[in-house]
Design a protein with these regions (language model features):
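Hydrophobic transmembrane alpha-helices
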Residues: 130-136, 146-149, 159-173, 228, ...
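Transmembrane alpha-helices
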Residues: 163, 195-229, 251, 255, ...
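Loop-to-helix entry region at the N-terminal start of transmembrane alpha-helices
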Residues: 88-100, 147-168, 208, 252-256
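Membrane-embedded alpha-helices of multi-pass transport/permease systems
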Residues: 107-113, 156-185, 208, 215-223, ...
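N-terminal, non-cleaved signal-anchor transmembrane helix
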Residues: 1-102, 279-287
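Short helix-to-coil transition segments within interhelical loops
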Residues: 177-183, 187-207, 233-235
Length: 287
């Protein structure tokens, strides 16, 4: 029986159809047709990560500069820090780090890929042993041997830095490729991918986080090891450090040391940002 308004009396009879629009229907009681809310994701790179370390480095460098402006420096100290000597040493250090890292990447990553292929897996222990020898040898001793062999110059310094930094990238490349899920690789082969396609589209993207971690370690190692290039005639910030030690001029030593530490921290910060930004999406949740 219907009332004069056309509605069923006493709640009996047919009811009005439920609204089909997700904005009109219930969304919180779990019975409506509205889609479940998606979980909010934290940004992969926060403002704190972007600004804290650079701000701290700028503050330290500014404090160092203000101290030098007010310090009473003798003629020898001023000569060691003037006429573009500091900028020249810093630029040489950056060049040594960049060139050595480039060669580390083009040597260690392809070699790591090669040593994970079935035909060359037996050679992996020997290659890792050589890489371990390169890093286990004291850097100053290795540089001295290279200077005896190649002579004084940047080439000996670069080879020593490269030999010292190959291990982390090589070992992380091998570990990253070996850690891939075999079922994913079989699925890729099952849909008709070639071996090269499996490597470039499945294996390497999954191994990117570990490879980038190795590259980050190698970068910091290169910045530190490049200070020893001065003993082989390679230049760099080590020139300021050794000059400050031999001449007993603490300000020169402080400048070389602070710039080396600041450059290492800056390189590590840039590498950490690259590690976050270049990581394939979906491999890890959160930053």
């Amino acid at each position: 029986m219907r009332t004069s308004s056309g509605r069923p009396e006493g709640g009996q009879g047919t009811q009005d159809p439920a609204p089909t629009n997700g904005h009109d229907g219930p969304s919180d009681d779990g019975t409506g047709a509205a889609p479940p809310p998606t979980a909010a994701r934290r940004p992969r790179v926060t403002w704190r990560k972007l600004t804290f370390l650079p701000a701290a480095l700028i503050a330290v460098l500014l404090a160092t500069w203000l101290w030098f402006e007010q310090a009473d420096l003798d003629a020898l100290t001023r000569n060691a820090l003037s006429d573009g000597q500091v900028s020249k040493a810093l630029w040489q250090h950056i060049e040594l780090t960049a060139i050595s890292t480039f060669f580390v990447l083009i040597i260690a990553i392809p070699l790591g890929i090669l040593l994970t292929r079935p035909r060359f897996r037996r050679a992996a222990p020997a290659a890792m042993a050589l890489a371990n020898m390169g890093q286990a040898t004291p850097a100053i001793g290795l540089l001295a041997l290279l200077v005896i062999w190649l002579g004084i110059g940047r080439r000996a310094a670069l080879i020593g830095i490269i030999a010292y930094a190959v291990l982390p990238v090589l070992s992380n490349t091998i570990a990253g490729l070996k850690a891939n899920d075999p079922t994913l690789l079989e699925a890729a082969r099952g849909i008709g991918m070639s071996p090269l396609g499996v490597l470039t589209r499945v294996e390497l993207p999954l191994a990117v986080p570990l490879i980038l971690a190795g590259v980050r370690t190698a970068l910091v190692l290169n910045v530190g090891t490049a200070t020893l290039a001065t003993f082989g005639g390679g230049g760099g910030l080590g020139v300021l450090i050794t000059t400050g030690i031999t001449s007993q001029r603490m300000p020169v030593l402080v400048v070389g040391s602070i710039l080396t530490v600041a450059l290492a921290l800056l390189v590590d910060w840039l590498a950490s940002l690259a590690e976050l930004l270049l990581r394939p999406r979906g491999l890890e949740a959160g930053p």
